Swiss-Prot record:
Domain of life of the organism encoding this protein: Bacteria
Bilayer topology annotation: Peripheral membrane protein
Subcellular location: Cell inner membrane
Enzyme class name: transferase
GO MF: UDP-N-acetyl-D-glucosamine:N-acetylmuramoyl-L-alanyl-D-glutamyl-meso-2,6-diaminopimelyl-D-alanyl-D-alanine-diphosphoundecaprenol 4-beta-N-acetylglucosaminlytransferase activity; undecaprenyldiphospho-muramoylpentapeptide beta-N-acetylglucosaminyltransferase activity
Protein role: Cell wall formation. Catalyzes the transfer of a GlcNAc subunit on undecaprenyl-pyrophosphoryl-MurNAc-pentapeptide (lipid intermediate I) to form undecaprenyl-pyrophosphoryl-MurNAc-(pentapeptide)GlcNAc (lipid intermediate II).
EC assignment: 2.4.1.227
The protein's annotated pathway: Cell wall biogenesis; peptidoglycan biosynthesis
Segments forming a coiled coil: none
Protein name (Swiss-Prot/TrEMBL): UDP-N-acetylglucosamine--N-acetylmuramyl-(pentapeptide) pyrophosphoryl-undecaprenol N-acetylglucosamine transferase
Binding residue positions for UDP-N-acetyl-alpha-D-glucosamine: 10-12, 128, 170, 199, 250, 295
Amino acid sequence: MNILFAGGGTGGHLYPAVAMAEEVQRMVPGASVLFAGTSRGIEAREVPRLGYRLHLLEVRGLRRGRSLKDMAANIGIAADFAAALASAVALVRRERPDVVVGTGGFVSAPVLFAAQLLGKKTLIQEQNAFPGVTTRLLSALATEVHLSFAEAARYLPKQKGVMVSGNPARSFTQVDASAAREHFGLDPSRPTLLVFGGSRGARSINNAVLRHHDLFCAAANLLWQTGSVDFERIRDACPPSRHLQIVPYIEEMGVAYSASDLVLCRAGASSIAELTNLAKPSVLVPYPYATGDHQRHNARALVHSGAAEVIEDSVLDSEESAAAIMELLHDGARRSAMSEAAGRLGAPDAARHLALRIISLAGTKQGS
């Protein structure tokens, strides 16, 4: 069985593909897996490190502005896409995959389209509540389309073969909350606010929490991943405290989630998958410049289900926003209701379910 995964650029597009690939090879030990990506994406480093084969294509995303400069750049990008499509056709013909899986990012479009032109079975896995342009354009020709949010279906041209399967995410082993807090040097008896904005951090989140950290630490523990860029600035501005732990990056994220009673973070698809799989109440701050404003769509889905609250990036540092976070830290019953709502949205078996669909499309029996 040969499976070709196309997706990357960011971890949000790559790691769901990796999770599915791992499950496919666990279920079908002899399965051959190949990734297609670009030299500029995270996949150029991560896929070889994980031990998978990687084929690089040169492709860029269209600029969304309307200036003459953007239009001129898009002419060159269109030429690049044509070349990438030709390379993708050659790749699909050479590798003869049984199924081609697209998870988004610039590279997924030419590879999926090439597979569809050649009559290959294709599966699209869409992470966001507002589907990416590749999903919207190519879903009508896909064999199956798997969504993380039911809301995404309304943006697709057809409903046949479309199903909600969740977003494959990292799995974490939960530990006792008190022990988890002690692991980070925090007061085990206090509720804990976990803050993160990605591996590089989020400047607006960091600035807002810096402004109000004394208020948060007066009532709770604050476990704060600043990212590498802001770490020294934030650390130097905050005196040491039994109720405050500032780190550039949290390696043991499962322990951090276990320690937390409330999470303040962006609304990226991977973070939301982790929050819902672990039934964590959250305050989401959508990144205002995300493509297609997809983080706001993601956050809205959780808010409508009662699993989260949203604070806009532009007002995060306000007194009102800090008060809203404090209110949640003081209201255990409300957090409990949010946790139950988040858990109902979770799909911890998403990678396994999608791997089974890939194996079925390939016409291969599990374990063969």
